[in-house]
Amino acid sequence: MALSVSAASARVQSLVPQQSLRGLKIGMLANQVRAVAGNPSSNRITSHPIMGKTRVMKFGRVQVTFRGTGKAATVVNLSTTSRNERTGSGIGVGSSESALAAKLKGERCVTELGYRHCYLGKWKPGSVVTDFSISKSGRVTRITLGLVID
């Protein structure tokens, strides 16, 4: 018996809005991130205006930000500019805002101070938001899953 798999059904869902990006999740520890993603291409300590010192790991075009720098520091932000990270319905960097609206349920699209974005979730401390940055040409340029801090 021959098995045929279409390209659409073979697509790996590497982005699950409100949940994960490439298997990485908000709240993970650095050792858990490395177990899923391997060694980062970049690993640095930066200063954040609200959180103080943070650790930022990069895995190609995926950036992982931790609240704090020690072993107990947890992931608070996952961001990508890679066209490879897609939802099960194919939404990702490069998708049009109209495609995002058609395939993503519950999103809200707004322009704030000249910044156009569509998001899922509530901007309430402790909540997770999935944010899709939209370019002036109406395409997704960055996708971020983040824990709302304040």
Across the structure, where does each feature detected by a protein language model lie?
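Second-shell loop/turn segments in exported
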Residues: 17-24, 84-91
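A small/polar (G/S/T-enriched), proline-flanked helix-loop surface module common
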Residues: 71, 77-85, 97
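Cleaved targeting-peptide boundary
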Residues: 8-16
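A cross-family detector of function-defining hotspots
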Residues: 28-70, 93-142, 147-150
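Intrinsic-disorder/low-complexity peptide segments enriched for small residues
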Residues: 1, 19-22, 102
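Secretory targeting and sorting signals
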Residues: 1-9
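Peripheral interaction segments used for macromolecular assembly
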Residues: 13, 52-54, 89
